[in-house]
């Protein structure tokens, strides 16, 4: 039976963002910060995409569970997401692992990260829970997923991507019937099941789940009492519901948000150096796959009061310039040339230097006569004069973190070891 609606379902929902992961495949980039706190797109943090989706979808109650090296993430949330008004029935809760349920345990898994705050969730009295991963780049209207959940009468609705079948081996994969009811859920299968009518494609979990709140609370209490459980949604909660209840797949193509310039549904896991670099560099294209300029679906974030970017010097061999690049506020390009690069706030690039396919995080200083190609430079790094990266693969690999595709991650610790 379809429920009668007098207001958007999102107004009776809470978004709960799981943001405690390290993101170890990003190597030194997450030595000082959790993966959701990693910078993206010249201005934002990765977590801002899930949070902006929730806000733009109409959800006004949000909780964020943090754990690994959470200081920079918590500071960002406190500064950039402090505009919710309790008198308007809005809330934004930052929920660090604090041993609320057990004096000896931190968050043991994704399900436990929700269970340990079960009293806070129940105090909000919402009808629906939208569980989100805080470490993916995408634009999605969760209201449409909530509508499908209610209309289908599902116990859980799982957001999913259609991916080539043999590329789905690293995901949780859903085997569905012709009505997208999930009949099996397999974590990282060697031979993923195909989609009915399209056997070369598979449905991969996005780590997005919609529940009726009471049902989820019952499932979490049951799971917490099971000594064999690993306290994880993908390994424990979802397989149990698939077997004993009704689980339905929600295809991302049904709720992805696209501007007039976006042709395909865009979702990225920027969990490796190569994927992170590529997703940022893609934004420099004339028509990027992800439109961050879409004013109808803004990506909210903390925005410091900074002066505009500045380009100085106009001599033949010393001209401040940028082509096919994104340059954020408070950057000074002093007689240097940028091509297909993305600079976050506060970057200084000094004379005669050249950057190509470079992702430069905030407050970096690049010395004169430097040539940097295919790099990710961590925040607050000081690049010495005359440094060349991107010409000699063997030398680059000895000095920096060089990826499979030849992208060099540069940190201050690596620079200090050069002795330049």
UniProtKB/Swiss-Prot annotation:
Involved in the biosynthesis of ADP-glucose, a building block required for the elongation reactions to produce glycogen. Catalyzes the reaction between ATP and alpha-D-glucose 1-phosphate (G1P) to produce pyrophosphate and ADP-Glc. One of its GO terms (biological process) is glycogen biosynthetic process. It comes from Sinorhizobium fredii (strain NBRC 101917 / NGR234). Belongs to the bacterial/plant glucose-1-phosphate adenylyltransferase family. Its EC number is 2.7.7.27. Pfam families: Hexapep_GlmU, NTP_transferase. GO terms for molecular function: ATP binding; glucose-1-phosphate adenylyltransferase activity. Alpha-D-glucose 1-phosphate binds at residues 107, 172, 187-188, 205. Homotetramer. It catalyses: alpha-D-glucose 1-phosphate + ATP + H(+) = ADP-alpha-D-glucose + diphosphate. PANTHER family: GLUCOSE-1-PHOSPHATE ADENYLYLTRANSFERASE (PTHR43523:SF2), GLUCOSE-1-PHOSPHATE ADENYLYLTRANSFERASE-RELATED (PTHR43523). This is Glucose-1-phosphate adenylyltransferase.
């Amino acid at each position: 039976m379809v429920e009668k609606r007098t207001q958007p379902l999102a107004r009776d929902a809470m978004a709960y963002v799981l943001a405690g992961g390290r993101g170890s495949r990003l190597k030194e980039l997450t030595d000082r910060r959790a993966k959701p706190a990693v910078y993206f797109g010249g201005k934002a943090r990765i977590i801002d995409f899930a949070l902006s989706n929730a806000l733009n979808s109409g959800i006004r109650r949000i909780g964020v569970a943090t754990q690994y090296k959470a200081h920079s993430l918590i500071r960002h949330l406190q500064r950039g997401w402090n505009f919710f008004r309790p008198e308007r029935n809005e809330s934004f809760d930052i929920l660090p692992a604090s041993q609320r349920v057990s004096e000896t345990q931190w968050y043991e898994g994704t399900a436990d990260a929700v269970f340990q705050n079960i009293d806070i969730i129940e105090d909000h009295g919402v009808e629906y829970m939208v569980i989100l991963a805080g470490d993916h780049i995408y634009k999605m209207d969760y209201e449409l997923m909530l509508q499908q959940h209610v209309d289908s009468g599902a116990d859980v609705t799982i957001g999913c991507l259609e991916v080539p079948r043999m590329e789905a081996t690293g995901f949780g994969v859903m085997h569905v019937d012709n009505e997208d009811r999930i009949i099996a859920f397999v974590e990282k299968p060697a031979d993923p099941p195909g989609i009915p009518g399209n056997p070369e494609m598979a449905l991969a979990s996005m780590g997005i789940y919609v529940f009726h709140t009471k049902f989820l609370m019952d499932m979490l209490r049951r799971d917490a009492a099971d000594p064999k459980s690993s306290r994880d949604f993908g390994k424990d909660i979802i397989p149990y519901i698939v077997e004993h209840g009704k689980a339905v797949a929600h295809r991302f193509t049904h709720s992805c948000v696209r501007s007039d310039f976006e042709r395909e549904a865009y979702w990225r896991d920027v969990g490796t150096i190569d994927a992170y670099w590529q997703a940022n560099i893609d934004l420099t294209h004339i028509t990027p796959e992800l439109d961050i300029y879409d004013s109808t679906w803004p990506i909210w974030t903390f925005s410091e009061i900074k002066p505009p970017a500045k380009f100085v010097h106009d001599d033949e061999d010393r001209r401040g310039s940028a082509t096919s690049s994104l340059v954020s506020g408070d950057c000074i390009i002093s007689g240097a040339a940028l091509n297909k690069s993305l600079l976050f706030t506060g970057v200084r690039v000094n004379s005669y230097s050249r950057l190509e396919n470079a992702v430069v995080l905030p407050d970096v200083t690049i010395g004169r006569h430097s040539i940097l190609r295919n790099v990710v430079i961590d925040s607050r790094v000081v690049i010495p004069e005359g440094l060349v990266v991107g010409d000699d693969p063997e030398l680059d690999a000895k000095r920096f973190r060089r990826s499979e595709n030849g992208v060099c991650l540069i940190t201050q610790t690596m620079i200090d070891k050069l002795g330049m």
